Amino acid sequence: MKQLIHEEKTQTTCVLRLFGAPLWTVQQAAQQADIAARCRGRGAEVLAALQAETPAGLEKARKALNGRFAAELYGEGETTLVHAAVQALETHRRLLVCCDADAGTLLEARLETVPGAEKVFDFGALSYADAKTREKLSARTCRVKGGPIPAKLARVQAAQRFVGADLAAGCVERAEDTVLFLGSRRGCWVRTVANTDAPALWLLDMIRRAASGLPQAAGTSWQKYGRAVPADVLTVQTLPDKPENTAPAKPPRKRHRVRNALIFLLVLALAAVAAAWYYTGGDLTALPQRLQSLGADSLPHAGAKLI
């Protein structure tokens, strides 16, 4: 124990784990806070390796990123997302069930590796794997019209109520994507994820955030029971892309140069008019004759010698 405390007090490096934050936002936040960080992204997960000269500097960097990414930051070091989800359920005393075997397949293989997961997840014993509960769920959803999405939303609500769980998970697997559902007493979070984008991890992150009372990631929508799910929610949701550079374009600068040149020429013209007015005594019509007389005076007279 003393050794661990000593290591914490002298630690100058650490690795923070985030899920649901675009890589570019983490890099930008570290740069703005003057934090020495190497960031690496894989899918929706980002690992940020922090380094500081002193333990106090490292703690300051930790707090800065935690303040910026409170919902996305789920752990440090070797902590995995599934461990973070189980810890959130345990800490806040939330019970999780699945309304169907598809959602159970996404979660069970990962949760069974975490000690104590059976305290917060039923592994189907009280829900979809129980014959009586499964019969009740089927009876509830067979009357729902509109296709698999409204039926799944009703099944999630029924599973949460019949079992008395705090959270109920479900999913609709399609050819190229999976629609994830996580229901509570008041409503349901819905997110559509590409099958290549690890739907199981997204569902675990939704569970972690919901259990902890944290806001869901961008693209995850809140849906009330009994209402139609909007079509845009049923399309694949991705994290925000980095905005393009908003530096001034070159054409406006060219227009500024042309305007300045015109102003300069106008000033020269006004100066010429003023000089002509002074030279002719206000009679500008005599200007051509005056100019001719100047030209005649400059010509050599007859008999003059050129030196």
Task: Please place each PLM-identified region on the residue numbering.
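Ser/Thr/Pro/Gly-rich low-complexity linker/stalk segments immediately outside membranes or between
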Residues: 282-295
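Intrinsically disordered, low-complexity cytosolic tails and juxtamembrane linkers
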Residues: 233-258
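A generic structural motif
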Residues: 44-55
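Short, solvent-exposed mixed-charge patches
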Residues: 304-307
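Membrane-anchoring helices that localize proteins to membranes
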Residues: 254-281
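Short alpha-helical segments enriched in small residues
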Residues: 2-8, 19, 23-31, 56-240
